[in-house]
């Protein structure tokens, strides 16, 4: 997909990993995805914030170009909450105003964990929770416009809410971001932002045609994420947002994660929302400090599609 220069409100636009040892996180993710990092913090500042850049050829449903291109894709930083050393991946959603988003979150019954603040000259951000406790963040852009590369190998491809209260989540996120849900196959549901497909067609005029050829459900061009019910046999799993990165080979990525000291939480499998024209192969991994994430590979059954 071509490099991004901003998003529209309600779209996932950035992810970062909060790590007790960010330098170790840089080593792991650099080895896994081939990311190159630059520290955005001054040497005298407390904590570190390493912005990751990725170069990759297009190989997704959105783009068949094999020209190499690159851009900022994510970051690895110090865990900001001293009392919470747990490593985790954080999802950010684009907003016009972090302060107005905070008001919508409160009105919808969510929580404001960290009030809106300016993160250097990068963005204005805040940390919220939905009524079930799933944490998420917002991104009011300043000098940094979020992820410049998405959907390509090594870049963000999907964000998912895992929750026990699907109905409550529908109501909350509709109020905060204007989302609705649609069926996306395999019994799954996607978060759809009306009009997002029109925005994407600025980058890819044939987007809807390509999605139809791939067997994507009607309205999939508006999907910005998914909603997954937490199973009853997982009582200790809290509500949370998860991140998925595109890769060239999910099986090889899982093996490489182990070599780098990570863990395979869910071995590679073919996702139930695969279709007759493509397979989504997915694995869930953990980094050495405990942050979890998924890696997926879009595998076209038709060699003319996304290959």
What are these regions (language model features)?
Residues 4, 40-154:
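Active-site-adjacent scaffolding segments
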Residues 74-77, 224-229:
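Glycine-centered structural positions embedded in regular secondary structure
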Residues 2, 7-9, 16-68, 107, ...:
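Core segments of cupin and vicinal oxygen chelate
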Residues 35-37, 59, 100-101, 181-182, ...:
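Short loop/beta submotifs within extracellular cysteine-rich repeat domains
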Residues 37, 72-73, 112-113, 181, ...:
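Residue-level detector of beta-propeller blades
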Residues 28-29, 33, 93, 105, ...:
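A compositionally biased, intrinsically disordered/low-complexity signal enriched
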Residues 1-7, 11-20, 50-53, 78-104, 110-152, 183-219, 229-234, ...:
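Vicinal oxygen chelate
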């Amino acid at each position: 997909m071509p490099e991004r220069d901003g998003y529209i409100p309600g779209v996932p636009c950035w992810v970062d990993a909060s790590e007790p040892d960010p330098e170790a996180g840089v080593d792991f993710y650099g080895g896994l995805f081939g990311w190159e990092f630059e520290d955005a913090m001054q040497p005298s500042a407390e904590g570190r914030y390493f912005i990751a850049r990725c170069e990759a050829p297009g190989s997704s449903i959105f783009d068949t170009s094999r020209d190499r291109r690159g851009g900022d894709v994510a970051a690895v930083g110090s865990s900001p909450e001293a009392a919470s050393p747990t490593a985790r991946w954080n999802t950010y959603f684009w907003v016009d105003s972090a302060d107005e988003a905070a008001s919508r979150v409160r009105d919808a019954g969510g929580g404001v964990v960290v009030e809106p603040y300016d993160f250097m000259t990068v963005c204005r951000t805040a940390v919220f929770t939905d009524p079930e406790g799933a944490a998420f963040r917002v991104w009011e852009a300043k000098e940094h416009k979020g992820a410049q590369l998405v959907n390509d190998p090594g870049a963000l491809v999907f964000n998912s809410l895992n929750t026990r209260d699907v109905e409550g989540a529908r109501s909350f996120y509709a109020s905060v971001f204007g989302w609705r849900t649609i069926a996306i196959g395999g019994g799954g549901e996607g978060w759809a932002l009306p009009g997002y497909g029109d925005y994407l067609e600025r980058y890819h005029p044939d987007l809807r045609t390509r999605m139809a050829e791939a067997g994507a459900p009607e309205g999939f061009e508006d999907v910005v994420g998914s909603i997954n019910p937490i199973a009853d046999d997982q009582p200790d799993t809290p509500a949370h947002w998860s991140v998925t990165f595109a890769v060239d080979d999910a099986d090889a990525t899982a093996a490489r994660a182990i070599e780098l000291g990570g863990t395979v939480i869910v071995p590679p499998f073919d996702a139930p929302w695969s279709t007759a024209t493509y397979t989504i192969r997915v694995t869930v991994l953990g980094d050495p400090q405990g942050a979890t994430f998924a890696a997926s590979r879009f595998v076209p059954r038709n060699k003319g599609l996304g290959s």
